[in-house]
Amino acid sequence: MPVKLSVNLNAVAMLRNRRDLPWPSVTALGRIALGAGAHGLTVHPRPDQRHIRFSDLPHIRALIDDEFPDREFNIEGYPSEDFLRLVEETQPEQVTLVPDDPSQATSDHGWQFQEHERFLAAAVGRLKRRGFRVSLFADPDADEAALAVAKAVGADRVELYTGPYGACYDDAEKAAKELRKLEKTAKTAQGLGLAVNAGHDLTVANLPALVEHVPSLAEVSIGHALTADALEYGMAETVRRYLSACEA
């Protein structure tokens, strides 16, 4: 099956929040992305609401329910009590749990699964009882023991952190090394019964090689690069380009 594309709207929200104005509209840009073929929308609401605001979530939920009922809403975040309540209110199809400190600019490392096993088991169990698919953020070189914990706590998927790959893409030797890590980790996860997502610093240029090396990839979530490209090419054309890259 082709890799699914979930468009992360955080960068759109950050641009909006530079001024006390209602535009660019997160919902309107989400509608364009879905209309161009994106399979879903992703947001990462942080406690300080510096990009996505809590008030955005019901509007995105309604957009998908009313106009694109075959698409998915993915909410990322650290599983604090406030976050879990927000998710339960919004009812996304997928919840991606990340080990971020609230002050971080972006997610930049995966879970230490053995260290946080009990904590994750409680959070994942709570979400699964509500019927959500749960993905856990994982380092690109997470080993079998770590991934086995992800499976044991009830996760459906892991999202592989692709930041190191994106950072060295212009260096063929380093990029090849990172791809081998991702390929190995994805195969291990799949062998344990975990589906595999990926995200962070993915671009229309580096996506095809990732898809080639990780054929089991279920979904990528892309925000910063896609939004930057949308400033030049428009959201609809940019989404079409990323969808083509997912099929390369």
From Swiss-Prot:
Record-listed 1-deoxy-D-xylulose 5-phosphate binding positions? R46, H51, T106
Q: Which keywords label this protein?
A: Cytoplasm, Pyridoxine biosynthesis, Transferase
The record ties this protein, via InterPro entries, to: Aldolase_TIM, PyrdxlP_synth_PdxJ, Pyridoxine-5'_phos_synth
**Where in the cell?**
Cytoplasm
What's in the GO CC field?
Answer: cytosol
Which residues bear the site annotation Transition state stabilizer?
Answer: E159
Gene3D superfamilies to which the protein is assigned, alphabetical: Aldolase class I
Q: EC number(s) per UniProt?
A: 2.6.99.2
Q: Where is the active site?
A: H44, E76, H200
The record lists 3-amino-2-oxopropyl phosphate as bound by N8, R19, D201, G223, H224
Classify the main location: cytoplasm
Extract the coiled-coil ranges from the record.
none
> Quaternary structure per UniProt?
Homooctamer; tetramer of dimers.
Relate the protein's function as given in its record: Catalyzes the complicated ring closure reaction between the two acyclic compounds 1-deoxy-D-xylulose-5-phosphate (DXP) and 3-amino-2-oxopropyl phosphate (1-amino-acetone-3-phosphate or AAP) to form pyridoxine 5'-phosphate (PNP) and inorganic phosphate.
What protein name is recorded for this chain? Pyridoxine 5'-phosphate synthase
Q: Source species, please?
A: Chelativorans sp. (strain BNC1)
Name the encoding gene, please. pdxJ
